């Protein structure tokens, strides 16, 4: 029997290159791995930015470096970033509001 399946690719987590030299950390590496995952059938990409402690604009800028070209190539992609490490939920999610503003109404960001 056939069942629809939604594949999510969690492409990097918080693993540093010292633990796994193949983990995508830079914007170029995240871009390449995300597009490869989408081409292989993933519907959703989950990726952390380069530094989990970055907040606000700094976190958003890092995501945007990778995700602007990904979403230009694959506007149908579903993407969700991680929350950042912070005391309050407002600070933890501040970068997502910036991303939504920067990327506009066509953004498909899950959370």
Enumerate the language-model features and the residues they cover.
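Conserved, mostly hydrophobic/aromatic
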Residues: 30, 37, 48, 110
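Glycine-rich anion/phosphate-binding loops
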Residues: 22-31, 61-64, 91-96
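Alpha-helix-loop-beta-strand connector modules within alpha/beta enzyme cores
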Residues: 3, 9, 55-82
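A structural motif
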Residues: 39-42, 107
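Hydrophobic faces of well-ordered beta-strands that scaffold small-molecule active sites
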Residues: 7-9, 45-47, 77-83, 108-111
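N-terminal small/glycine-rich loop or linker at the start of catalytic domains
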Residues: 1-22
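Extended substrate/RNA-proximal surfaces in nucleic-acid metabolism proteins
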Residues: 88-111
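Active-site beta-loop-alpha junctions enriched in small/polar residues
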Residues: 10-14, 50-52, 82-87
């Amino acid at each position: 029997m056939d069942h629809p399946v939604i594949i999510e690719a969690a492409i990097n987590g918080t693993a540093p290159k010292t633990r796994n030299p193949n983990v995508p950390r830079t914007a170029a590496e995240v871009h390449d791995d995300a597009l490869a995952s989408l081409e292989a059938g993933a519907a959703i990409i989950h990726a952390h930015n380069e530094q989990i402690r970055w907040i606000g604009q700094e976190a958003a800028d890092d995501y945007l470096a990778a995700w602007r070209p990904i979403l230009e190539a694959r506007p149908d992609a579903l993407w969700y970033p991680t929350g950042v490490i912070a005391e309050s939920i407002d600070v933890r999610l501040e970068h997502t509001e910036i991303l939504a503003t920067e990327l506009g109404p066509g953004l498909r960001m899950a959370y």
